[in-house]
Amino acid sequence: DLALTLVTLAVGATMVLTYFVPYVDPGSVWFFPVLGLAAPAVYVASVVLMLYWIIRWRWVCAGAMLVVVVAGVFKVSLFWRPEIRRSYATETAFDRAAVKVMSYNVRSFYGEDGRSSVDDILRLIEEQAPDLICLQEFNARLAEQSEEFSLLGEKYEIAHFGRTQAPDSVYGSTLTILSKYRILRSDTVLTPSSSVWADVIVGEDTVRVFNNHLRSTAINASDNQFITSHQFLSDTARETKIRSIVTRLRENSVLRAAQVDSIAQVVGATRTRRIVCGDFNDTPVS
């Protein structure tokens, strides 16, 4: 039991640390962003160890893990939110004054197979008929070639922003806000590809709509294959791969935190009603 006791201590300590992830600047403690990714697995491990010690009647270890597990109960919904009694047979009825908002990273209108998905996505928007739309990685060139987009433009006012000039931007994507309400003005918070806003008139109110696309984790297809399939690599190659992934997670978490600070200042200083949308590229525990 000594080995499992040590494992329990390690898992319990790690679980406690995950509770502090949202409150610690990624730039000050480098491993906290990685803990955020591991939080669901650590929580499951904590539950398993708690049950093990209960079965063994080791109440000190069981009690310690029970405290850790109970402390995390309210965070479980961040990862898993079962809707056992929800029915999809009927649509939810909304108040007539409700505003329907859609936020969608359209990935430059390219699907997983590399083919254009612009018409499919625009048809989905047409079917859902949202009042406000925030699109990330919007490819203006492909959109403007689509007849569906022309039809969409007849129903929505569109706030266009400049194209991304980043060297890794293959398709020149940017952020776009579409509104069935009149757009008064629009501007950028950081860059046209990371954070923008538009003021729209909803009834008698001015509402500022923020559209954000924060720094990604930079985890690519090769990294996903390595993580999910336990791809066989030599010890040296495995160490290099893990070091590369962790380094990118850390560096991009720091950059993302700086973006959040800048955006939060602008959102906080906004005197009108606000709607904040976007692809935030982070874990629920962040």
Residue ranges and their predicted role:
Residues 98-106, 121-146, 162, 198, ...:
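Active-site beta-strand/loop signature of hydrolases that rely on acidic residues for catalysis
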Residues 6-57:
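Membrane-embedded alpha-helical segments of integral membrane proteins
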Residues 26, 32-44, 67-72, 88-100, ...:
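Active-site surface patch of divalent metal-dependent phosphodiester/phosphate bond hydrolases
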Residues 1-3:
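Membrane-anchoring hydrophobic segments
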Residues 33, 98, 103-118, 140-142, ...:
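Acidic/histidine-rich helix-loop elements
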Residues 88-93, 126, 181-183, 203-205, ...:
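The feature marks either
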Residues 43-88:
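Transmembrane alpha-helices and immediately adjacent membrane-cytoplasm interface residues
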Residues 191-237:
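Active-site catalytic loop in hydrolytic enzyme cores
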